[in-house]
Amino acid sequence: MSERIKTAALRDFSVSLCRAAGLSADDAALLTDSILFAECRGVTSHGLLRLPQYIARLRSGATASNASMPFTMESGGTARLDAQNGLGQLAGRKASDKAEELAAEYGVSFVAVANSNHFGTGAWYAIPAARRGFFAFNISSAASAMAPHGAAQPLLGTDPVGLALPRGEGKAPLALDMALSTAARGKIRYAALNGTPIPETWGLDAHGAPTTDAAAVLDGGTLLPAGGAKGSGLAIFIELLCAVLTGSGALGGTGLLSDLSRPAGTGHIFGCVDIKRFLPLKTFEALCEESLSRVTSLTPSQPGGEILLPGEPEERRAAESAANGVPVAPALRDTLNALAEELGCAARI
């Protein structure tokens, strides 16, 4: 059974491990913030589970621990950052801050990031920008895991999309953070572990046939895009923007986080729109609330059901985590404590 651990204790532990792996105090705190943002919101696939992978890449040199990440181009509302194979979260934060800065000056911004790594959850960047009055978006390339529509082999990444806009005082921004596969790879792994069948729409086996066997999807098979041709088409566009436009490489060239033999070569795009350039922010927020109330006031499709807006389930989990601590599975806890011992770090959870 998972034991709940206070966020402050998890933060101290994660920072200690990151410092032991060679990160500066500031960089360790930033990476930890990204990890706990995801963990506290229930997005466990991008939370503490990722910490051993990030540290393994840092220790092996697959990810650079001291990249300076210069901006190699700035023109009007656009910019390009070379992450120099540094941590994706550090590059992403620097780029998203630049996107806000440029949007404040020019009204809109478009910032490309080349030669990066896995950047965590898109909402971690978009929500703070939305709180400051911007519509914010981000997209990223990812390692090949998903077949293009009609194909039997993986080529596309799950290519996450993050969006957020402000809703006014006292309300969390409306936020959408999603990958473009029908189901997350983590869900399929969980089904395989428990021997439970999956819907045929989730993946193909190694022969290109739809399957309800989760293990067959993972063993030489492929994930399928959400919405068939629609999700596939959107993923192709994201790959061309994030891989090709940024200068990171060609479609399908992004490396796996677990592959310590090479740089990941991940590309990202960050952008912001300064809402008050179009209409007063308060007016925008009021009209959004009126519009969203029309959604939530509809009759639920299931008796006793509830209509939730994008990001609301995660905000509820975050509030629960803040009040009661974060549930950490025993196996993950053991893994993290073993890693701490290996690093010569005294911290434990």
Regions from the language model: what does each represent?
Residues 146-216:
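Phosphate/diphosphate-binding glycine-rich loops and adjacent basic-rich segments that engage nucleotide
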Residues 185-250, 258-263:
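Small-residue-enriched flexible segments
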Residues 46-100:
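Active-site cofactor/substrate anionic-group-binding motifs, chiefly glycine-
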Residues 4-6, 10-13, 20, 250-349:
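Catalytic-core signal marking the mid-to-C-terminal active-site face
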Residues 3-7, 24-47, 63-74, 261-265, ...:
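N-terminal glycine-rich anion-binding loops that anchor highly charged ligand groups
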Residues 15-26, 33-44, 56-63, 101-105, ...:
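Generic secondary-structure signature for well-ordered alpha-helical cores
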Residues 78-168, 175:
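A generic, well-ordered mixed alpha/beta core segment in the N-terminal half of proteins
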